[in-house]
């Protein structure tokens, strides 16, 4: 009986040590939010700076020239097409 008590008393620190080691292991769902926030802000600043540099450099241009149109210009074109189609005589099909 005494040997069983001695063995149990020797195993108790081992069991407690293994429980303490499990607590010390890193939780896979733990995130370092401070580092994540700083990394995101740095990434946003870099993208913002690249966008401003592209706008200011004026190297990003269209390959063809476009004339600026007035806001009602498209409506006038549609009305002209309608009136020209109505003015043309209908061809009779045989």
Curated annotation (Swiss-Prot):
- Signal peptide start-end: 1-17
Chain ranges on the Cytoplasmic side, renumbered to this chain: 58-94
Q: Where are the transmembrane segments?
A: 35-57
Which body tissues produce this protein?
A: Expressed in the neuronal fibers of the medial part of lateral habenula nucleus, thalamus, hypothalamus, stria terminalis, zona incerta, amygdaloid body and cingulum, olfactory bulb, hippocampus, cerebral cortex and cerebellum. In the cerebellum there is a predominant expression pattern in the granule layer of lobules VI-IX of the posterior lobe. Detected in inner ear.
Q: Name where it's found.
A: Cell membrane
How is it placed in the membrane, per its record?
A: Single-pass type I membrane protein
* Alphabetic keyword roster: Cell membrane, Ion transport, Membrane, Potassium, Potassium transport, Signal, Sodium, Sodium transport, Sodium/potassium transport, Transmembrane, Transmembrane helix, Transport
Instruction: Name the predominant localization.
Output: membrane
| Gene Ontology annotations of biological process type | positive regulation of sodium ion export across plasma membrane; potassium ion transport; sodium ion transport
List, alphabetically, the InterPro entries matched: FXYD_motif, Ion-transport_regulator_FXYD
Q: Which residues lie on this side of the membrane: Extracellular?
A: 18-34
Q: Name one GO molecular function term.
A: sodium channel regulator activity
Query: GO cellular component annotations, sorted alphabetically?
Result: glutamatergic synapse; postsynaptic membrane; presynaptic membrane
SUBUNIT field: Regulatory subunit of the sodium/potassium-transporting ATPase which is composed of a catalytic alpha subunit, a non-catalytic beta subunit and an additional regulatory subunit. The regulatory subunit, a member of the FXYD protein family, modulates the enzymatic activity in a tissue- and isoform-specific way by changing affinities of the Na+/K+-ATPase toward Na(+), K(+) or ATP.
Q: Which family does it belong to?
A: Belongs to the FXYD family.
Provide the function of this protein: Associates with and regulates the activity of the sodium/potassium-transporting ATPase (NKA) which catalyzes the hydrolysis of ATP coupled with the exchange of Na(+) and K(+) ions across the plasma membrane. Decreases the apparent affinity of the transporter for Na(+). In addition to modulating NKA kinetics, may also function as a regulator of NKA localization to the plasma membrane.
Q: What is this protein called?
A: FXYD domain-containing ion transport regulator 6
